[in-house]
Regions:
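Membrane-interface segments at the starts/ends of alpha-helical transmembrane spans
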Residues: 41-51, 104-112, 142-145
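Solvent-exposed soluble domains appended to multi-pass membrane proteins
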Residues: 251-365
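Soluble catalytic regions of membrane-associated enzymes that act on cell-envelope
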Residues: 168-289
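Internal/C-terminal transmembrane anchor helices
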Residues: 143-169
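Aromatic-anchored segments of alpha-helical transmembrane domains
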Residues: 22-28, 86-97, 156-162, 338
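Membrane-embedded alpha-helical segments of integral membrane proteins
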Residues: 81-139
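Membrane-interface anchoring determinants
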Residues: 6, 74, 130-150
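Membrane-anchoring hydrophobic segments
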Residues: 1-86
C-alpha cells in the first residue's frame, strides 16, 4: 500500500511541476504583451498590466483549480492528467486574444464551447472514476512508472493544444512588444523587436517609423526593415494602421475644422516621398533643407540622390560620392548577372535588401 501511495505521489508531483513551469513561462515569456493589450482594451486604458504579478497569480489560481478538481474526482491513476483540463482550458481561453481586441470585445465561440466542454468533461470524468477501481496497480519502470509516462504524455498533448489555440501571430506579438516598450520610452530597444523577421504589416511599419523618428535614425535605418503601405502607413488611420496601447504624438491628432491636419516633422516628409518612390519631390525638398555634399547626410538620402542621378536623363541635381557610386555600380553589376527575375531578386535582397535602391526597384509600396 505504501509503495502504491509513493508511486502515485511521484506521478502527481511530476505532472504538477510540468504544469506550473509551463503555465508560468507561457504567461511571462510568450504571451505577456498580448495579455497587457487585452487588459488595456477591456479596461479602457484605466488599468495597467503587471508583468510580474499576473503570471504568478494566474499560475497559482489555475493550479489551485486543478487541486480542487482532483479533490472532487480523486482520479489518480493513468487518467490523472485530465484533472488539469479545466485549468488548461481557461489558460487557452485567456491567451486566445484576437488581433482586433481593441474594437471587438467578445469571447466569440468560447461563449458556448466552454460550458459544452465542461459538461462533456464532467461526464467523462465520472465514467473514468467508476472504471479506475478496476485498473491494475501501477507498475514501476526503470525510471518512471508506466502510469507516469502516460500522464506526462497526456499533459503534453493538452499543453500543445493550449499553444495552438493561443494567439501565435508573430507580427501581432512584435507590435504589442514594441508598444509596451514605447510606452516606457524605450524606443531603441523597441526597434530590435522582430528586426530579423521578414514579416510585417502597416501597423508594425508605423511603429518602427515612430521609433526611428524618436531615435533620429529614420534616414539611416528605415529601409533596413521590411515595409508595407507606403507613406499611408506612417500615420495611424485606426483601421488598417493603428496603435493599441501607445499614445500617438499630438501632431498626428491635430484637427482643423473637424478634419485631421498634419504638420509632419522633416524626416517624415522626406521619407514619405521615399516610401512612395517620389524621388523628384524628395530631391527638391532635401536640397532645400540639407547640404547634400556633406558626408553626414543620412545614408538613405545619399542612396536616393545617387539613384536619382543615374535614372534621370537631365537631373536637376548631380550627386557625387565615390563610395556610394562604387556601391551602386556593384548593385547594377549584380542585377545584370542574373537573367532570371526570381534569382535576381533573391540575390539583390540578400546583398542590398537594406538599401533604398532595392526598395525603389523591387520593393512593394
Amino acid at each position: 500500500m505504501e509503495k502504491k501511495r509513493n508511486s502515485t505521489t511521484k506521478m502527481r508531483l511530476t505532472c504538477a511541476i510540468i504544469f506550473i513551469v509551463f503555465t508560468y513561462l507561457y504567461l511571462s515569456c510568450y504571451q505577456p504583451d498580448l495579455l497587457a493589450v487585452a487588459q488595456h482594451a477591456l479596461s479602457g486604458g484605466m488599468t495597467q498590466y503587471n508583468y510580474v504579478l499576473f503570471p504568478i497569480l494566474t499560475t497559482l489560481v489555475l493550479f489551485l483549480l486543478q487541486c480542487g478538481v482532483f479533490a472532487i474526482t480523486r482520479v489518480k491513476k493513468r487518467f490523472h492528467a485530465l484533472t488539469y483540463f479545466p485549468s488548461l482550458l481557461i489558460l487557452a481561453i485567456i491567451t486566445d486574444i484576437p488581433t482586433d481586441i481593441d474594437t471587438y470585445h467578445s469571447l466569440g465561440s468560447w461563449c458556448w464551447l466552454f460550458p459544452l466542454l465542461l459538461i462533456l468533461y464532467s461526464g467523462i470524468m465520472w465514467v473514468i472514476r467508476q472504471l479506475e477501481a478496476y485498473e491494475p496497480d501501477i507498475q514501476k519502470g526503470l525510471w518512471l512508472s508506466r502510469c507516469t509516462w502516460i500522464n506526462v504524455l497526456s499533459l503534453d498533448v493538452m499543453i500543445l493544444l493550449v499553444i495552438l489555440i493561443g494567439n501565435g501571430n508573430d507580427v501581432f506579438h512584435y507590435r504589442m512588444r514594441m508598444e509596451s516598450l514605447m510606452c516606457e520610452g524605450k524606443y531603441q530597444e523597441a526597434l530590435e523587436v522582430g528586426a530579423q523577421s521578414a514579416h510585417t504589416d502597416s501597423s508594425l511599419t508605423m511603429l518602427r517609423i515612430a521609433c526611428l523618428h524618436k531615435t533620429g535614425a529614420m534616414g539611416d535605418k528605415l529601409f533596413t526593415y521590411p515595409l508595407v503601405g507606403g507613406s499611408k502607413a506612417m500615420i495611424p488611420d485606426s483601421v488598417t494602421t493603428k496603435s493599441m496601447m501607445w499614445t500617438t504624438p499630438k501632431w498626428m491628432r491635430k484637427k482643423v475644422r473637424g478634419k485631421f491636419y498634419y504638420v509632419k516633422p522633416l524626416d517624415y516628409q522626406l521619407n514619405a516621398f521615399l516610401l512612395d518612390k517620389k524621388i523628384d519631390q524628395f530631391v527638391h525638398l532635401v536640397q532645400s533643407k540639407y547640404n547634400i555634399e556633406n558626408d553626414s547626410l543620412p545614408t538613405h538620402y545619399k542612396e536616393a540622390l545617387m539613384l536619382y542621378t543615374h535614372r534621370r536623363l537631365h537631373p536637376k541635381v548631380v550627386y557625387r560620392n565615390a563610395v556610394m557610386e562604387a556601391d551602386f555600380q556593384d548593385f547594377q553589376t549584380l542585377e545584370r548577372k542574373y537573367p532570371n527575375a526570381m534569382e535576381r531578386n533573391a540575390a539583390l535582397r540578400d546583398t542590398y535588401g537594406n538599401t533604398y535602391w532595392y526598395y525603389y526597384l523591387y520593393g512593394k509600396e
